[in-house]
From Swiss-Prot, chain B:
Changing residue 4 to S: Change in subcellular location: Becomes partially cytosolic and retained in association with the Golgi apparatus. Partial reduction of ubiquitination. The modification Phosphoserine is found at residues 14, 25. GO terms for molecular function: DNA binding; ubiquitin protein ligase activity; zinc ion binding. Interacts (when phosphorylated) with 14-3-3. Interacts with the E3 ubiquitin-ligases NEDD4, ITCH, SMURF2 and WWP1. Also interacts with the E2 ubiquitin-conjugating enzymes UBE2D1 and UBE2N, but neither with CDC34, nor with UBE2L3. Interacts with ZNF350, EPS15 and STAMBP. After TNF stimulation, interacts with TAX1BP1, TNFAIP3 and RIPK1; these interactions are transient and they are lost after 1 hour of stimulation with TNF. Interacts with GGA1. Its main location: other. Changing residue 40 to A: Loss of ITCH-, SMURF2- and WWP1-binding. Partial loss of ubiquitination by ITCH. No effect on STAMBP-binding. Persistent TNF-mediated NFKBIA phosphorylation. Loss of stimulus-dependent complex formation with TAX1BP1, TNFAIP3 and RIPK1. The lineage of its organism: Eukaryota, Metazoa, Chordata, Craniata, Vertebrata. This is RING finger protein 11. Ubiquitinated in the presence of ITCH, or SMURF2, and UBE2D1, as well as WWP1. Phosphorylation by PKB/AKT1 may accelerate degradation by the proteasome. The PPxY motif mediates interaction with NEDD4. A lipid is attached at residue 4 (S-palmitoyl cysteine). The modification Phosphothreonine is found at residue 135. Pfam families: zf-RING_2 (PF13639).
Length: 38, 154
């Protein structure tokens, strides 16, 4: 299991049901799960 | 003259590998080479629904009965055939060039949805419309009752 998201990150789903990730500190969004980026 | 012709450095190559390894470690449900993810928004926008064409309610304000009706409506909409606009094909796309809901021309590759009356619209445009009024915007024909009954018996 990947464990909790790093601080400041939030997992969201877009209107097509695809999962993406939001970083409230840097205000960026990305498809990649930050937990799998090491 | 700038260094636009510089040979790839080890950094460039490692970056290449890095982006490939990123793709291998994606979260569920994401496609690597899709368009960029949605822009940053402080709060997740709460969906707004229309129990009747004249009413607008936050998803959190709907009664249980309204939630059920809207869920059924969404189910019905998903049953309607969808495709991609291709003027080259012989289908109804040949005649219809503009989405009358947004008044924009169809562009090759646009996601579209066909109604039983064979009028076509942008997928997002008609899905929004059908959530308010389950009729064809062009000919006002109610979406085929057969579609309704076949959905309810499943």
């Amino acid at each position: 299991p990947l464990g909790p998201l790093p601080p400041g990150w939030e997992k969201r789903t877009d209107s097509n049901g695809r999962v993406y990730f939001v970083n409230h500190n840097t205000r960026i969004t990305q498809w990649e799960d930050p937990r799998s980026q090491g | 003259m700038g260094n636009c012709l510089k040979s790839p450095t080890s950094d460039d190559i490692s970056l290449l590998h890095e982006s490939q390894s990123d793709r291998a470690s994606f979260g569920e449900g994401t496609e690597p080479d899709q368009e960029p993810p949605p822009p940053y928004q402080e709060q997740v926008p709460v969906p707004v629904y229309h129990p009747t064409p004249s009413q607008t309610r936050l998803a959190t304000q709907l009664t249980e009965e309204e939630q059920i009706r809207i869920a059924q409506r969404i189910g019905l909409i998903q049953h309607l055939p969808k495709g991609v606009y291709d003027p080259g094909r012989d289908g109804s796309e040949k005649k219809i060039r503009e989405c009358v809901i947004c008044m924009m021309d169809f562009v090759y590759g646009d996601p579209i949805r066909f109604l039983p009356c064979m009028h076509i619209y942008h997928l997002d445009c008609i899905d929004d419309w059908l959530m308010r009024s389950f009729t064809c915007p062009s000919c006002m024909e109610p979406v085929d009752a057969a579609l309704l009954s076949s959905y309810e018996t499943n």
